[in-house]
Amino acid sequence: MRIALINENSQASKNPLIETTLRKVVEPMGHTVDNYGMYTADDACQITYVKAGLLAGILLNSGAADYVVTGCGTGEGAMLACNSFPGVLCGHLVDPSDGFMFAQINDGNCVALPFAKDFGWGAELKLEMIFRQLFGFGHGNGYPPERVVPEQRNKKILDQVKAITHRPMIDILHDIDQTFLKETISGEHFAELFYPACKDEAIGAYLKAL
């Protein structure tokens, strides 16, 4: 699985800590991590939580990422922004049990974490435990065991609902404010990470043309 890390600007200084912790957990599992920044608070590309949502939508709908880890001060804004886009099912994770239950019950492809609220002493240990619970036990297996069948059924129903209520990502890219879109994909390493991994020719071609 290719996991993309996105940090919004208010918590950019924590990117190295989050990346190191994420890699420590998931790379031994065979997963790959692509760090889309922000890398420092002074980066030229300033990713707000709304841009984090747009970037998550681009990565997941193009196939350039299989999973997105993002967040903001509370995680709420990033979660709301991510869920604004088609093909993105984002959960808000506060503790390790959230990680396990979101993976098993909701089977999403994106998570938003609070990187300021309650992010104090031992934060890297909490992150490590969340990532182990999120990625270490598969996805969509249900919890508790007696709820597996209805939970898996409801997930399929939710996917069908989202397919109806959301527009195709390529249409959104055409209609969204183009300056906002250009700013979102102007990260230092966006091109070198995104284009080789992109599986959607229409999305890739449109963004490259910008």
Q: Language-model features: where?
A:
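A short beta-strand-loop structural module common to alpha/beta enzyme folds
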Residues: M29-Q46
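Short, ordered loop/turn segments at secondary-structure junctions
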Residues: M38-Y39, G73-T74, S97, F115-D118
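Short, structured active-site "lid" loops
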Residues: T48-Y67
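Short Gly/Thr/Asp-enriched flexible loops that form oxyanion-binding sites at enzyme active sites
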Residues: G77-C90, V94-D95
